[in-house]
Amino acid sequence: MRRVKGTLFVDYVRMLRSRKDVDWSRHLRHEDLAFLGERVQDDAWYPMGTFERMGLAILAEISSDMQVVQAWGRAQIDWLCVVHENLVAPGDPCETLMRFRVLRSSFFDFSALAVPTLNDGEASVLVEYGMSPPAEEAASWQTLGFFERLLEVAGARKVSARFVSTSWTGDLVTEIELRWQT
């Protein structure tokens, strides 16, 4: 069973809890709903299947606009920088991405993300969450926003992020191209 760390899982739970007007049982399994009543532990592991279903529920009930999903990914950085104080190397985007490489296994217990290419001013990120196409698309947009903001917090300027390939449209893998100036 693939799992996600509580530091990421908590964002989905918070979003669902914030909408008391929605009947989440229409989208989630009984075992998923139990997490809405529990305290999410930052360092605990949670089922990726539940994470995927929660993400799809958010898309269905809150927003299916990928620009909103991208903005949510950007917003995650501020919280993760509090939890992982050494994630950002101020003034050094490359070192920050190197630190992410080290930390990435602490977010998922499988190879969801890879940074195979990293040079000054450019990098590529491979995304493979192994979810259904709609969930994979949303998670990839969230990831794109995450890396945009991570680079900005590290001091990068003129950050550009774009998809080179997308698994949800039939490509073998999703690849994000990152470019920036320092």
Task: Give short role names for the model-derived ranges.
Residues 22-34, 98-102, 158-167:
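Short alpha-helical "patches" and their helix-cap loops
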Residues 31-39, 79-80, 166-176:
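Short, mixed-charge aromatic SLiMs
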Residues 39-142, 165:
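Amphipathic interaction/junction segments at domain boundaries or subunit interfaces
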